[in-house]
Amino acid sequence: MKYTSYFLALLLCGLLGFSGSYGQGQFFREIENLKEYFNASSPDVAKGGPLFSEILKNWKDESDKKIIQSQIVSFYFKLFENLKDNQVIQRSMDIIKQDMFQKFLNGSSEKLEDFKKLIQIPVDDLQIQRKAINELIKVMNDLSPKSNLRKRKRSQNLFRGRRASM
């Protein structure tokens, strides 16, 4: 798990970019600290291939990419939560989390709190499962209105175009 954690922290750097409120140099130093701590340069880290970069290659559209990135960011937040008591790497994780927070959640504390709540929901709890199934229709409806709205607007524009040319 230690090698995997380190490798994931390294991938985070490439996934989310290198700029941020702490600057490139600071961000790179913190990634290097994590690499050293987890011995991520060891050849056995590469066994089995990368965790996320191959998956990300399949997601070309920017809005689609956000979907998979949200799952990856969720993973990193869980990883950092599991390592929160490790004082040796705490500062590095805090800086990386802050940069991730700025890039992925646009610095919104409310979004961060909601995101944390979501990743903490236990999926093996029967009451949670029942609530989730109860809300499934609403969630599915929330997922689809944008595409229906676009189709409706496109249809209206086509209809208007026909009326104008008649």
Swiss-Prot record:
GO cellular component: extracellular space
Keyword match Secreted: yes
Gene label: IFNG
Residues annotated with Pyrrolidone carboxylic acid modification: 24
GO terms of biological process kind: adaptive immune response; astrocyte activation; cell surface receptor signaling pathway via STAT; defense response to virus; extrinsic apoptotic signaling pathway; Fc-gamma receptor signaling pathway involved in phagocytosis; humoral immune response; macrophage activation involved in immune response
Top-level division of the source organism's lineage: Eukaryota
Complex formation: Homodimer. Interacts with IFNGR1 (via extracellular domain); this interaction promotes IFNGR1 dimerization.
Protein name: Interferon gamma
InterPro entries (alphabetical): 4_helix_cytokine-like_core, Interferon_gamma
Tissue: Released primarily from activated T lymphocytes.
Function in brief: Type II interferon produced by immune cells such as T-cells and NK cells that plays crucial roles in antimicrobial, antiviral, and antitumor responses by activating effector immune cells and enhancing antigen presentation. Primarily signals through the JAK-STAT pathway after interaction with its receptor IFNGR1 to affect gene regulation. Upon IFNG binding, IFNGR1 intracellular domain opens out to allow association of downstream signaling components JAK2, JAK1 and STAT1, leading to STAT1 activation, nuclear translocation and transcription of IFNG-regulated genes.
Record keywords, A-Z: Antiviral defense, Cytokine, Glycoprotein, Growth regulation, Pyrrolidone carboxylic acid, Secreted, Signal
UniProt-listed Gene3D superfamilies: 1.20.1250.10
Residues glycosylated per entry: 39, 106
Protein localization: Secreted
Keyword Flavoprotein among UniProt keywords: no
